[in-house]
């Protein structure tokens, strides 16, 4: 888990070779457990095998960024439609509760703790909305896309949560989204969600270009 988090957070760079000697020292683990962890990360497309004996951090590209985020945005929009059609009173209450918790976190500092807490509440808010769809398999597919987007999202997360202006904009978006979902305006809620999930793209593109 620590290795996965370090890759997502950019502590290991794309295409960087993962030397077993460094990993055993860093995580105080034996070669066996590390190979298991690396095999799992290969399956998750965060690590690639080099010549069947070594490992590297998987590459990142603008093409992959656009593909993953487009897939996520369209998947989330569909799930919102289903959630509005199927969700009951308990679903509405959970969406409201998670929206409230997210809105309470307004502090803006550079600590990892702040980033983690905001992201946890942000994920919980979005998960509460789509949970109303009632489909275990669709939610599994959504989680898979979320994992694929994780490294790109963390680039966006650092730039967004550490900016008062951007954080306020996100707060406004979440308020509008919550109100529209609870009003059960399916068409508008779906489109708002789709656009909401696409907004990080320009920020990530700038960061990847070194701007």
Language model segments and positions:
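Short, flexible turn/loop "capping" segments at secondary-structure junctions
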Residues: 49, 122, 169-171
């Amino acid at each position: 888990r620590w290795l996965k988090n370090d890759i997502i957070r950019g502590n290991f760079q794309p295409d960087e070779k993962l030397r077993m000697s460094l990993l055993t020292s860093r995580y105080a683990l034996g070669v066996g457990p590390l190979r298991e962890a690396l095999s799992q990360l290969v399956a998750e497309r965060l690590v690639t095998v080099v010549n069947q004996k070594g490992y590297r951090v998987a590459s990142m590209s603008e093409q992959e960024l656009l593909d993953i985020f487009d897939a996520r945005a369209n998947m989330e929009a569909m799930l919102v439609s289903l959630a509005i059609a199927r969700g009951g009173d308990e679903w509405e209450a959970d969406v409201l509760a998670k929206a409230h918790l997210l809105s309470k976190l307004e502090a803006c500092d550079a600590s990892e703790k702040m980033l983690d807490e905001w992201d946890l509440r942000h994920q919980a808010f979005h998960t509460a909305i789509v949970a109303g769809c009632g489909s275990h398999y669709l939610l599994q597919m959504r989680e898979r896309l979320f994992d694929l987007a994780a490294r790109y999202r963390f680039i966006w997360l650092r730039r967004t949560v550490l900016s008062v202006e951007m954080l306020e904009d996100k707060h406004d978006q979440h308020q509008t989204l919550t109100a529209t979902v609870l009003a059960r305006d399916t068409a508008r809620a779906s489109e708002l969600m789709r656009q909401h999930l696409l907004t990080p793209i320009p920020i990530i593109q700038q960061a990847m270009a070194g701007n």
